[in-house]
Amino acid sequence: MQKYVCNVCGYEYDPAEHDNVPFDQLPDDWCCPVCGVSKDQFSPA
């Protein structure tokens, strides 16, 4: 599955570490657990 990286702090969202939930299926109000920015601040890894 595709990983995504926060453009602000570099946090990497890896679906394998989150019950195999793809990034695009996360809730719209999901935010970076490190710096708190929204999903639109992430890019494919």
From Swiss-Prot:
<dbReference type="GO" id="GO:0005506">
    <property type="term" value="F:iron ion binding"/>
</dbReference>
<dbReference type="InterPro" id="IPR018527">
    <property type="entry name" value="Rubredoxin_Fe_BS"/>
</dbReference>
<comment type="function">
    <text>Electron acceptor for cytoplasmic lactate dehydrogenase.</text>
</comment>
<dbReference type="GO" id="GO:0043448">
    <property type="term" value="P:alkane catabolic process"/>
</dbReference>
<comment type="similarity">
    <text>Belongs to the rubredoxin family.</text>
</comment>
<feature type="domain" description="Rubredoxin-like">
    <location>
        <begin position="1"/>
        <end position="45"/>
    </location>
</feature>
<feature type="modified residue" description="N-formylmethionine">
    <location>
        <position position="1"/>
    </location>
</feature>
<dbReference type="GO" id="GO:0009055">
    <property type="term" value="F:electron transfer activity"/>
</dbReference>
<keyword id="KW-0408">Iron</keyword>
<feature type="binding site">
    <location>
        <position position="32"/>
    </location>
    <ligand>
        <name>Fe cation</name>
    </ligand>
</feature>
<dbReference type="InterPro" id="IPR024935">
    <property type="entry name" value="Rubredoxin_dom"/>
</dbReference>
<feature type="binding site">
    <location>
        <position position="6"/>
    </location>
    <ligand>
        <name>Fe cation</name>
    </ligand>
</feature>
<dbReference type="InterPro" id="IPR050526">
    <property type="entry name" value="Rubredoxin_ET"/>
</dbReference>
<keyword id="KW-0249">Electron transport</keyword>
<keyword id="KW-0479">Metal-binding</keyword>
<feature type="binding site">
    <location>
        <position position="35"/>
    </location>
    <ligand>
        <name>Fe cation</name>
    </ligand>
</feature>
<protein>
    <recommendedName>
        <fullName>Rubredoxin-1</fullName>
    </recommendedName>
</protein>
<keyword id="KW-0291">Formylation</keyword>
<comment type="function">
    <text>Rubredoxin is a small nonheme, iron protein lacking acid-labile sulfide. Its single Fe, chelated to 4 Cys, functions as an electron acceptor and may also stabilize the conformation of the molecule.</text>
</comment>
<feature type="binding site">
    <location>
        <position position="9"/>
    </location>
    <ligand>
        <name>Fe cation</name>
    </ligand>
</feature>
<dbReference type="Pfam" id="PF00301">
    <property type="entry name" value="Rubredoxin"/>
</dbReference>
<keyword id="KW-0813">Transport</keyword>
<keyword id="KW-0963">Cytoplasm</keyword>
<dbReference type="GO" id="GO:0005737">
    <property type="term" value="C:cytoplasm"/>
</dbReference>
<dbReference type="InterPro" id="IPR024934">
    <property type="entry name" value="Rubredoxin-like_dom"/>
</dbReference>
